[in-house]
């Protein structure tokens, strides 16, 4: 190959593979990211395998930067080609740790273009190095696969749809890392995808393929606006162009960016002057006028010239515009009606003005848009949104949420369209902050209804004090009809307006629903809050995620963890079960990582997932809060022996709790030094007898079989076992509160562990929810107890089913005996194991082990385990697993911990 081929990737392959015929040739720069785009089955993967040497065609040519790898005379095998290949499904060695997988393909030579530490830092793998692949989420495994490919010191990186098998949440986790690779490494990348949204974020060059042939190749923005190619006429037609930051207007929150052909003003946070930004201008956001308007709300009005027009179709026409008066600037697209074109008399070569109504910052340096705040150790500070979607016409201003600067007493938490009073997503969020020891003024809105059930107004409750406050004003008697969505919208609108008027530091709203996505609901109120400089924290259903991004520009923090989305996954028990489990694990793992990255919000805003931190206990007043069905109960907990002398040590960094939290709890009596065994004795042993119990009936609870300490409340519906809790209610001062639940497709037994910590022991205790779908209609319930030298996993014995009461509906109705036993430096509550004399059961009779009836072993979800271990350390945790029958109640019980 001559010097003419230097700086290029040249490839040409012809051949037949079964019925598929490949006849493709390309010549692209050997720098930056070149995307190969096309529909499934067009030959993208085949041409990548040919370049890598994994597929050999007799008629082929391949040269990289002037070095020939294949021609008619020679063929360099795959193992001798310096290519890093990242497949759709990451293939990691299961017997090696993350560190071992990364170093496996690294060359032995000392000279390297990219080092181990640099790869670990770029991809955020520090916290994962000691883990096994089965304990990684899908996104984490793919990041490890990318790191292993980079450490092989390749001259070319091939990425074959690396995000195709991932859900949107996990894609958004990985894309910022790919952007960092693009910005910091000079390595050429061939990126294969059929998703234009991925390509628009970081690709420089584009190759279009169709039916085994290359139909176009060139710079991304040129091909997007080429009237001879289908991209310009697609429904989501847009052009991606790069601009340089020239200035920032602090007053209006506007960036001024210079593009080829003029200046664009885009709402954004502050970005350094000279930084390069990727902009996306959709054809539907560009209108055309013959003369510059003197008065208009549209900020971006640029001189342009019509390059060409598409033939009219379906009443619309796509027009290619060249910015600048002579049309020599960057090309953009405009989609208008055929009638508008005729009324304006538009023709090729005509000078016009382009009104750009909306501009999206596809990739913003600084990563403030959508950033989750300060990062946890081992995590990268990166953007988490796919498209900031900042809209000029909306007047929104993108900004990060800096939790360090937020006054905890100036946070408005608004419960929008509540379904179960305080038993809702936002209530859980605010109460989590209270239980975690955070000093935050959570405000929850509640609807006020008259005797007929019609809504007549609102009230707001401060979750910290329980007092009613006046942030929301009543709307007047009879103002709303009952069961109308408009009522909830109007109430929430008043609440948002009141929060804006009081100039709060943060607005927390529990959902962004389909009404906002359709252009109704709280769009105006939220836009007003954003315009006033108040960040918004919300939970967004995945189906509304794009609408949220387009509307708000990713303002603040978006968590894809809404309860309804998860529950919808669990309701489907068809062949999609395996995929649902993977999706749920990925979402939950993502949420755990997010929660670990926030110093203020220690737990994820989601009902189906809870991650708790241990509380340092004061030896003079050790108390724990337990919330059951929205009611806060406070009970004493035991101070473990040996902790009294060391409990004054500071708590772990990043978890600001201490004596001030203890001091504001009411005095409920002395702290017991030791727990005594508790027994729950019930004479009801069979499902038939269980069904005969009446709702509200109570069964006595005795201590050591003699002293009555409480009752079991039987709250049962009808003979079909409608869900209802059975609660062990203890008198004031009793050490433990336990709840069980009986319901359709739900068998639940859980423990509330004393969350203590012996200072210096470097142990943590956390209780988290692990729920995953299985094909069996019955589910096992299990506890897992881990320590530095012991790892016990003994599921609770499966309960039987009652014929004729629905299909395979489990019945939890045997006699239950609970006792409390010490376990190292913590106490664990669980079913008592019958004595066994066999030597083989010595481990079960160990007094330091929580005795649980043995049953079939079941592994813990690797995604959840890996994410949990990143926060709390491996094996230093306690957790409970639940079936998918009713995720809401299962999560509620763990929220109570």
Swiss-Prot record:
Gene, per the UniProt record: modC2
Protein's organism: Bradyrhizobium diazoefficiens (strain JCM 10833 / BCRC 13528 / IAM 13628 / NBRC 14792 / USDA 110)
Protein name: Molybdenum import ATP-binding protein ModC 2
Keywords: ATP-binding, Cell inner membrane, Cell membrane, Membrane, Molybdenum, Nucleotide-binding, Translocase, Transport
Chemical reaction(s) catalysed: molybdate(out) + ATP + H2O = molybdate(in) + ADP + phosphate + H(+)
Similarity remark: Belongs to the ABC transporter superfamily. Molybdate importer (TC 3.A.1.8) family.
Binding residues annotated for ATP, in chain numbering: 38-45
Residues annotated as signal peptide: none
Function summary: Part of the ABC transporter complex ModABC involved in molybdenum import. Responsible for energy coupling to the transport system.
All residue ranges annotated as the Mop domain in the record: 295-365
Phylogenetic lineage: Bacteria, Pseudomonadati, Pseudomonadota, Alphaproteobacteria, Hyphomicrobiales
């Amino acid at each position: 190959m001559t010097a003419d081929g230097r700086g290029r990737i040249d490839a040409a392959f012809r051949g037949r593979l079964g019925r598929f015929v490949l006849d493709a040739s390309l010549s692209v720069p050997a720098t930056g990211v070149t995307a190969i785009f096309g529909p499934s089955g067009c030959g993208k993967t085949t041409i990548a395998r040919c370049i890598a040497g994994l597929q050999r065609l007799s008629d082929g040519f391949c040269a990289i930067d002037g070095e020939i790898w294949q021609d008619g005379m020679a063929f360099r095998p795959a193992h001798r080609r310096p290519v890093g290949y990242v497949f759709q499904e990451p293939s990691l060695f299961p017997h090696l740790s993350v560190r071992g997988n990364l170093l496996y393909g690294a060359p032995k030579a000392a000279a390297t273009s990219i080092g181990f530490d640099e790869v670990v830092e770029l991809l955020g793998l520090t916290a994962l190095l000691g883990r096994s692949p089965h304990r990684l989420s899908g996104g984490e495994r793919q990041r490890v696969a990318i790191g292993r490919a980079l450490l092989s010191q390749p001259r070319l990186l091939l990425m074959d749809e690396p995000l195709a098998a991932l859900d949107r949440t996990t894609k958004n986790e990985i894309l910022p890392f790919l952007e960092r690779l693009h910005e910091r490494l000079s390595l050429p990348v061939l990126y294969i995808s059929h998703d234009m949204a991925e390509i628009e974020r970081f690709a420089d060059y584009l190759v279009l393929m169709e039916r085994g042939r290359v139909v176009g190749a060139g710079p991304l923005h040129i091909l997007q606006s080429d009237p001879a190619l289908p991209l310009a006429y697609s429904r989501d037609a847009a052009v991606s162009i790069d601009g340089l930051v020239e200035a920032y207007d602090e007053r209006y929150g506007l960036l001024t960016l210079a593009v080829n052909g003029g200046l664009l003003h885009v709402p954004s946070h502050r970005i350094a002057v000279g930084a390069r930004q990727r902009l996306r201008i959709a054809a539907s956001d560009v209108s055309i006028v013959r003369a510059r308007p003197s008065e208009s709300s549209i900020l971006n009005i640029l001189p342009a010239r019509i390059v060409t027009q598409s033939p009219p179709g379906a009443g619309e026409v796509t027009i290619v515009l060249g910015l600048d008066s002579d049309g020599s600037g960057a090309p953009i697209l405009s989609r208008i009606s055929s009638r508008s074109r005729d009324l304006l008399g538009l023709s090729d070569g005509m000078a016009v003005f382009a009104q750009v109504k909306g501009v999206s910052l596809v990739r913003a340096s600084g990563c403030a848009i959508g950033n989750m705040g300060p990062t946890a150790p081992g995590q990268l500070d990166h953007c988490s949104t796919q498209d900031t979607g900042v809209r000029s016409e909306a007047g929104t201003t993108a900004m990060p949420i800096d939790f360090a600067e937020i006054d905890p007493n100036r946070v408005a938490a608004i419960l929008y369209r509540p379904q179960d009073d305080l038993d809702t997503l936002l209530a859980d969020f605010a109460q989590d902050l209270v239980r975690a020891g955070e000093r935050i003024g959570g405000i929850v809105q509640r609807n006020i209804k008259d005797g007929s059930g019609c809504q007549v107004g609102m009230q707001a409750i401060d979750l910290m004090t329980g007092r009613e406050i006046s942030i929301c004003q009543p709307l007047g008697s009879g103002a709303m009809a009952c069961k109308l969505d408009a009522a909830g919208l109007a109430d929430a609108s008043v609440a948002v307006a009141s929060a804006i008027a009081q100039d709060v530091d943060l607005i927390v709203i529990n959902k962004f629903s389909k009404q906002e996505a359709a252009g109704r609901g709280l769009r105006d109120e939220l836009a007003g809050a954003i315009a006033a400089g108040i960040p918004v924290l919300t939970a967004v259903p995945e189906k509304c995620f794009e609408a949220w991004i387009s509307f708000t520009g990713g303002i603040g923090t978006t968590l894809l963890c809404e309860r309804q989305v998860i529950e919808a996954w669990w309701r489907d028990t068809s062949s999609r079960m395996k995929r649902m489990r993977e999706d749920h694990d990925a979402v939950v793992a993502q949420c755990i990582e997010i929660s670990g990255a926030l110093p203020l919000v220690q737990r994820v805003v989601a009902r189906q997932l809870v991650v708790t931190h241990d509380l340092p206990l004061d030896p003079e007043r050790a108390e724990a809060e337990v919330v059951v069905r929205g009611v806060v109960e406070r009970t004493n907990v035991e101070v473990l022996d040996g902790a009294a002398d060391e409990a004054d040590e500071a708590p772990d960094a990043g978890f600001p709790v201490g004596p001030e939290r203890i001091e504001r709890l009411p005095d409920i009596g002395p702290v017991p030094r030791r727990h005594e065994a508790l027994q729950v004795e019930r004479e009801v042993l069979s499902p038939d007898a269980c069904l005969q119990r009446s709702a509200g009936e109570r069964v006595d609870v005795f201590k050591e079989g003699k002293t009555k300490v409480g009752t079991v409340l039987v709250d049962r519906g009808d003979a079909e076992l409608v869900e209802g809790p059975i609660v062990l209610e203890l008198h004031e001062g009793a050490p433990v509160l336990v709840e069980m639940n009986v319901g359709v497709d739900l068998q639940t037994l859980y423990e509330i562990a004393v969350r203590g910590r012996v200072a210096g022991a470097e142990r943590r205790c956390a209780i988290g929810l692990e729920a995953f779908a299985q094909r069996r209609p019955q589910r096992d319930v299990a506890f897992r107890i881990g320590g530095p030298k012991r790892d016990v996993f003994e599921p609770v014995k499966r309960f039987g089913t009652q014929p004729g009461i629905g299909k395979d509906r489990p019945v939890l109705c045997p006699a239950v005996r609970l006792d409390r036993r010490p376990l190292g430096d913590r106490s664990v509550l669980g079913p008592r194991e019958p004595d066994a004399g066999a030597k083989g059961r010595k481990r079960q009779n160990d007094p330091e082990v929580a005795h649980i009836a043995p049953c079939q072993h079941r592994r813990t979800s690797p995604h959840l385990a890996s994410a949990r271990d990143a926060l709390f350390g491996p094996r230093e945790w306690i957790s409970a697993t639940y079936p998918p029958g009713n995720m809401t109640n299962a999560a509620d019980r763990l929220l109570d911990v």
